[in-house]
């Protein structure tokens, strides 16, 4: 994985982080879900544990991540094709 996420999408306290991974056959992407919560008065933490009320929102975030990745894969393929033609 890269040291910096390719993209983050957030709805409220839920977010997905999208990572771009470089492989021999091109880029591939992975998604990490997270839920932020406050411990005490001022310390924010993250967990990958979701409650019942989080599921539909996280489903929407996964849908948005899927769409973003699909567009990136298309852009990656176009760039590879143009690079191959230039060589």
Regions found by a protein language model. Give the residues of each.
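Single-stranded nucleic acid-binding surfaces, predominantly the OB-fold ssDNA-binding core
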Residues: 1-87
